[in-house]
Amino acid sequence: MFNMNVDESASGALGSSAIPVHPTPASVRLFEILQGKYAYVQGQTIYANLRNPGVFSRQVFTHLFKRAISHCTYDDVLHDWNKFEACIQKRWPSDDSCASRFRESTFESWSTTMKLTVRDLLTTNIYRVLHSRSVLSYERYVDWICATGMVPAVKKPITQELHSKIKSLRDRCVCRELGHERTIRSIGTELYEATKEIIESLNSTFIPQFTEVTIEYLPRSDEYVAYYCGRRIRLHVLFPPAIFAGTVTFDSPVQRLYQNIFMCYRTLEHAKICQLLNTAPLKAIVGHGGRDMYKDILAHLEQNSQRKDPKKELLNLLVKLSENKTISGVTDVVEEFITDASNNLVDRNRLFGQPGETAAQGLKKKVSNTVVKCLTDQINEQFDQINGLEKERELYLKKIRSMESQLQASLGPGGNNPAASAPAAVAAEAASVDILTGSTASAIEKLFNSPSASLGARVSGHNESILNSFVSQYIPPSREMTKDLTELWESELFNTFKLTPVVDNQGQRLYVRYSSDTISILLGPFTYLVAELSPVELVTDVYATLGIVEIIDELYRSSRLAIYIEDLGRKYCPASATGGDHGIRQAPSARGDTEPDHAKSKPARDPPPGAGS
């Protein structure tokens, strides 16, 4: 993924004491966070406003427009005006009765035409520059600042294709307009020179991707070095990181948010795992129980014993006694057992006529005193032995399963066992699935194939029984943590870069804009250090949010051209110059062409020489 392509001479210069700064697992994760890979929340959308190059585009537009329109002289404007006036007088002979209105109309037409011509010339060519593809990326610059606080920059030569575009731009800028040749030519020439500088600067510097750069720290010289495609490049360290015991901690917003972001991400991952595990809602607690163990013993005796086995008969007696809960039921069971057993005995008292207990009475007494106790001890001993064998069986089964899983994992898809290749391929595919973004079936298969997950939900052993069952749907709450992370993102970006929120009447934030501090912190280093645009003046926070049309109007009002035109208007038609918009006469009001009171009180001045016929 990464181009660790430092040549041998460069690596020898680094020495063994160089500390890797980027790429490392920590630095790569910072860029992946900016790309939305881990816990992308609503507060991170402010970062999209931060990396928007619109403010830089307005700065370039303001610089080009202001520089071009200010590159004109009073003599050029006066020459163009005299030329225009002479042409008008040839076509429209003046009349003394309406000379004042004629001068006003003539000057208003010329000043408005001049403004529209200059505006069209500048905006058309500046738009071509702003919307053309440039090598320098403001978005990558913001990514490097927010992730590491350092910006690598690569110098590259201007291509021949770009030279051809600059040459064609000269033909468009340096043009001739009827009546405004000298002024428009001066403005167009300066626009071409300024545009050429901007285009060459924006296309001679390149900010590479974070996957293409290697950055290391040299403790001996206390400097950071960057390498791109095997050669050393410039590295602007705006916010130096902290290095302790070989660990690099960047001084950046994402580094400060790193811990909270991954806490939220792991919580979301935990919630997803719980959701997958609880897809089957019925869960059971399985344990060992001995209540029905006698059934296995009876089945064993039934298969292996003789037809009339004393052990079987006595065990049946004990089973029937345990199943009866009443005294009458126990009495009936004992009487039935004695009756069956006494039929096979010879009663010597009855045979020889001896007095005393009968055989049935003696048998009953013997059963109640001796036989039951002996058989109970024997059966308990057998039960203990069976339990031990069951535990030993389960232990060996677990060992066998563990050995099978290890063998299957070691063989893999290309192993010698063809029967295990298909399951191994399925397991490998399931293991590559992302739990958060992968399909539910693949994620569940991945969890069930994990050797550390005990996901059995059935009674597998002969000596196991369900102790309790319940419906489990627990999912860790993550909404509060996501909300906290959103607020933390907003607070970090607002306070680090001094952004200004724009809200509506209800207090809801619509968007954020650059403040004067944001321009100094973020746009200043990009303009003067990275792009090396030293003639460009930083845009003000007012222009950072205005539209292009509004910026044009503001720049034209404060330009030299507007001041020169206003001065010509005062000299040529002094009665109507006051109240005009920098020499451009406003439309008359609904009250008519009446003069204001302060104009009536002043004595009328003579027109300047050369004004009129």
UniProtKB/Swiss-Prot annotation:
Family: Belongs to the herpesviridae portal protein family.
Predominant location: virion
Compartment list: Virion; Host nucleus; Host cytoplasm
Bilayer-crossing regions: none
Physiological role: Forms a portal in the viral capsid through which viral DNA is translocated during DNA packaging. Assembles as a dodecamer at a single fivefold axe of the T=16 icosahedric capsid. Binds to the molecular motor that translocates the viral DNA, termed terminase.
Identification of the protein by name: Portal protein
Highest taxon, organism lineage: Viruses
Quaternary assembly: Homododecamerizes. Interacts with terminase subunits TRM1 and TRM3.
One cellular component (GO) term of this entry: host cell cytoplasm
A biological-process GO annotation: chromosome organization
Disordered as annotated region, ranges: 577-613
Basic and acidic residues composition bias: residue spans: 592-605
Organism: Epstein-Barr virus (strain B95-8)
Keywords: Host cytoplasm, Host nucleus, Viral genome packaging, Viral release from host cell, Virion
